[in-house]
Amino acid sequence: MLAGGRLRWWQWRGRDCAVQSQMVVDAHVHLHPERLAEAIRRWFDAHAWHIKYRAGVDDAVRTLREGGVARMVALPYVHKPGLARALNDFTLDVSRRNPEVVPCCTVFPGEEGGEEILEEALSGPFRGVKIHSHVMKIAPDDSRLDPVWRASGRWRKPVVIHCGPEPANPGYGLDTRTVSGADRLRRALDRHPDAIVIVPHLGFDETPQFEAMLAEYPNLYLDTTMVVGAFFARQPDVDILRRHPDRILYGTDFPNIPYEWDHELKALRTLKLPPRDEEQILSGNALRLFGPDAQ
């Protein structure tokens, strides 16, 4: 038992967790206010897939908690200026109601007061920053992101940036390859070598290019979100998990997914990684990167 009578991750009586014997941290979840969440669901319904989990934030947290997930890293993101501060406040409130939630902040690059928003958030309880190149229509090496990279290096907190080209979905209203790619991130990191960066989805479909960067940029990491469970017709070489277990985090995109919450967890388990490697991917790397609030 934990302080206050809360159960440890393996003691919940919900659905069996795909990995019952070790701590699981989902390093990629989205917990948005209902109005924004509904708009996101409509977008996915029109352009991608039908989201399976459509209840509110607290129900989403409960689903993961009762399944055995010990911590979940909340990654808010905005599509236009003027929304970040309120969304950050919402995310922090969710984390205060649900101690399993590790709050990250967001900012719209270049917006008025953006640097102040970052400083307020990262000097406080927020454990990282979420940027989405497709949604925000901004490439990693765009100068408007320089304050984000600087803040990451200064506060030693990661930036989770979706900057792999896929999904190249016309619903974004642009050619995603114009704002993404390993080379664009490389240019940003050459300017800001102290920034800590997590690229979701193993950087698909430029996974080999992002993997090649791991040796050169020690602060670069990848996550597994939606690319180890064979949902898409194409997926990256999952043996990357064997080659770099210390640089990859487990994540899901929950609740914005078309299948059971543990679909990818079970797929990862079937890889039969060495126990130490599996532990690093499922929790160790996330605990190290997101700091004491994730412990």
Labelled PLM ranges:
Residues R127-G128, D142-L249:
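Catalytic pocket-lining loop regions of alpha/beta-barrel enzymes
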